[in-house]
Amino acid sequence: MTAAENVCYTLINVPMDSEPPSEISLKNDLEKGDVKSKTEALKKVIIMILNGEKLPGLLMTIIRFVLPLQDHTIKKLLLVFWEIVPKTTPDGRLLHEMILVCDAYRKDLQHPNEFIRGSTLRFLCKLKEAELLEPLMPAIRACLEHRHSYVRRNAVLAIYTIYRNFEHLIPDAPELIHDFLVNEKDASCKRNAFMMLIHADQDRALDYLSTCIDQVQTFGDILQLVIVELIYKVCHANPSERARFIRCIYNLLQSSSPAVKYEAAGTLVTLSSAPTAIKAAAQCYIDLIIKESDNNVKLIVLDRLIELKEHPAHERVLQDLVMDILRVLSTPDLEVRKKTLQLALDLVSSRNVEELVIVLKKEVIKTNNVSEHEDTDKYRQLLVRTLHSCSVRFPDMAANVIPVLMEFLSDSNEAAAADVLEFVREAIQRFDNLRMLIVEKMLEVFHAIKSVKIYRGALWILGEYCSTKEDIQSVMTEVRRSLGEIPIVESEIKKEAGELKPEEEITVGPVQKLVTKMGTYATQSALSSSRPTKKEEERPPLRGFLLDGDFFVAASLATTLTKIALRYVALVQEKKRQNSFVAEAMLLMATILHLGKSSPPKKPITDDDVDRISLCLKVLSECSPLMNDIFNKECRQSLSHMLSAKLEEEKLSQKKESEKRNVTVQPDDPISFMQLTAKNEMNCKEDQFQLSLLAAMGNTQRKEAADPLASKLNKVTQLTGFSDPVYAEAYVHVNQYDIVLDVLVVNQTSDTLQNCTLELATLGDLKLVEKPSPLTLAPHDFANIKANVKVASTENGIIFGNIVYDVSGAASDRNCVVLSDIHIDIMDYIQPATCTDAEFRQMWAEFEWENKVTVNTNIIDLNDYLQHILKSTNMKCLTPEKALSGYCGFMAANLYARSIFGEDALANVSIEKPIQQGPEAPVTGHIRIRAKGQGMALSLGDKINLSQKKTSI
């Protein structure tokens, strides 16, 4: 262990502007000052020793004049002083003065004040000198019988530490602590004693647990947690003990402490794969999610449930708990609800889908009754998508779901209404038996639709699937109702002119008597010349869309009118009725064309919309069989092809996902019989407690051995040259929210380098946690220095700096070696993610930062280039493989990723292969990146620029 890594128990801030006191003045204050002066002097002595000063002349002064004082502040400071002061001579022998200190320790261990006793015992845990501890052992033992629990629990800790470091001083410690544990009543004392037995003498700990296994539920939560840890470790090391302790774990699932329940459930899952055990653990997790108020806890426990689901055998057990899992939806947090719905959808089966749909329908109705909120709208979207997926997987449920969801087509939130419309479109195409019901409900809500986008979709569905005369007539009636009085231009001009006519003045509310200051009545008019503005008038929806200049809906309406008119002609034999219906449809199109080229709309009609409406007029005037087939057959086939491709893509992704799951046991694996297995072979699973401890300490072992390129050596950055007096290289270890730089510093000179300091600075969203300590390097010596850097976002970060040092015996200024810059790889923080096309488009429209990267590569194949970019940026391609397959000379794809900080990154790849330049021509085009923050967009662009120049492998 290097000097920089030595454990430091006490950190004291030193004011930089204060002048260090002299040893003489300190000695004078310690000898002759009052208690306050001695306290201040002792503080200064402690700070100076921490800064490297020796001050050997003050040791005896402190023993003579400060140690006998009974002031509690002095006693606290003395504990710090004795911890840091050198206690041995250079040759390792104990200083003679420490015998006097040892006597003071003994007196403090017998002090009537329990705080002084307890803090002294805690201090003894830090002592590494057996000669100091040996005379104190009787006093430490006596503290086990003190009346106050604070003293007893610290006595246990002291005995445990001394036994671990110097077993010969107290060889009977396990037996002593076992006897203490049997008679002890205080929970914290029992916890410390039991913890010691676990690590010092596990057999005694098990014996004690066996005697009180039925009373475990009555213990305090801190002791219960230690018991869970012991059972896990014992059963992990010796699986034959599982039957002995599994009942205890079952009992601890009923503990009043959430932490104990969580640990017990996790332990139960690792100890047993029996359905009853899995069900009990899952039920415990669900209760924790519902009862805990902290959303982070809910998400962590939900992840444990999702992990359980990944196991095929456990998945069947969890399917019976779907309704219990849905109770979690009572949580208002959107992320928790999202994970819960996804989990429920993964677990739903034909046995419980009906109950699931009932619950989700109730939740949808609830969202309509609560006050509008951004999360409410998003939650409604999640519910709609879940019901959509249920209906596709279980067609029998669609009839129950459709009537409830179609009410939301008139919702003011366009995103939720769009999800409903997408579901209705798929349902009406897939389920022939539901078409009448859907058309009927669509006609009911048609007039109330507020969004033009939803209106267009509803028009398309009605035009495509109205197959009876009555339905077709109903559609025409609804369109006329939604369009209002025609011709539109004339009626609008009349309204404009009517606003200026005095005779059309309208009466306002009841007249009140108004009295002036003079006491006379004021004159009032019962008429008002002001009329409501256009925006205040209640316009029919379609008329409103057209007057606002949105003529794309008019083109959609023209197509719908053409479809239903052609269908009406085929259904009705009477020529007069045929002509009447077709003429009405053509009149509506003509009046819309007239409106588009006149002044009332805010924006004129576009040429594309004019062409579309004119084409529909021409089709209706001719009524050819070819046009009839195109409008009434091929349009529907296009939708059918799209839905089939979508379903196939979903099945393919599900298949890939299932293939990713690691197979626990291969068919040809040998069967392991427990009785025939050597004890050391049973530890097949990793110790979860050890893994969590390593993760907390930042020492998580990554599985890098399988990939040689992912080894630590691949992440070593050279910071200086081989010819520099100090050579340095760094290993950049990236954790989730911080970076650890492990810097190797080598003195390549024949001089001793003093105060060798690594000075670092950061650029970007990085923050240096602490300044590395100075070192002294002998000739040709080396040392490791560690520096922690906090990361707050995925912005590209740079760490730069230098190494400064003094040469021993030289009179020159400090020497400096400038280090190479360390660039932090953004890819360590970006993870592939998925989202729907609608979400992608919405984010693309919302995100304001765009970075356009020009393709500059020597890769000649479009698909190879796309795969190279995906690998380099760690993004996921959202465009289906079928859409990318084949060769046509150009390619467009959407990519998506999320950072661990919750930032979204979108990219659109638009590339082509210039045919005129021959088969060996490189790919050209550009990549557009969008993100909410500038840092993400620029960082991802830089990464693509760096990586695309590499040759495709």
From Swiss-Prot:
Recorded GO terms, molecular function? structural molecule activity
**Which segments carry the HEAT repeats?**
96-131, 132-168, 240-276, 277-314, 316-353, 396-433
Q: What else is known?
A: Brefeldin A induces dissociation from the Golgi of the beta-COP and presumably the other coatomer subunits.
Q: What does this protein do?
A: The coatomer is a cytosolic protein complex that binds to dilysine motifs and reversibly associates with Golgi non-clathrin-coated vesicles, which further mediate biosynthetic protein transport from the ER, via the Golgi up to the trans Golgi network. Coatomer complex is required for budding from Golgi membranes, and is essential for the retrograde Golgi-to-ER transport of dilysine-tagged proteins.
Where does this protein reside within or beyond the cell? Cytoplasm; Golgi apparatus membrane; Cytoplasmic vesicle, COPI-coated vesicle membrane; Cell membrane
Assembly: Oligomeric complex that consists of at least the alpha, beta, beta', gamma, delta, epsilon and zeta subunits. Interacts with CAPN8 and PRKCE. Interacts with SCYL1. Interacts with COPG1. Interacts with ARF1 (myristoylated); this interaction is required for binding of COPB1 to Golgi membranes. Interacts (via trunk domain) with ARF1 (via switch I region); the interaction is direct. Interacts with KCNK2 (via N-terminus); this interaction increases the channel-mediated whole cell currents and promotes plasma membrane expression of KCNK2. Interacts with STX17. Interacts with TMEM115.
Q: What name does UniProt use for this protein?
A: Coatomer subunit beta
Q: How does it sit in the membrane?
A: Peripheral membrane protein
Q: Where is the signal peptide?
A: none
Tissue specificity remark? High expression in the lung, kidney, skeletal muscle and small intestine, and lower level of expression in heart, liver, spleen, stomach and fat.
Q: Name one Pfam family in it.
A: Coatomer_b_Cpla
Q: Which UniProt keywords apply?
A: Acetylation, Cell membrane, Cytoplasm, Cytoplasmic vesicle, ER-Golgi transport, Golgi apparatus, Membrane, Protein transport, Repeat, Transport
Give Gene Ontology CC terms: COPI vesicle coat; endoplasmic reticulum-Golgi intermediate compartment; Golgi membrane; plasma membrane
Q: List the disulfide bonds.
A: none
What positions are modified (N-acetylthreonine)?
2
GO terms of biological process kind: endoplasmic reticulum to Golgi vesicle-mediated transport; intra-Golgi vesicle-mediated transport; intracellular protein transport
Modified positions (N6-acetyllysine) in chain numbering = 494
The protein's organism comes out as Sus scrofa
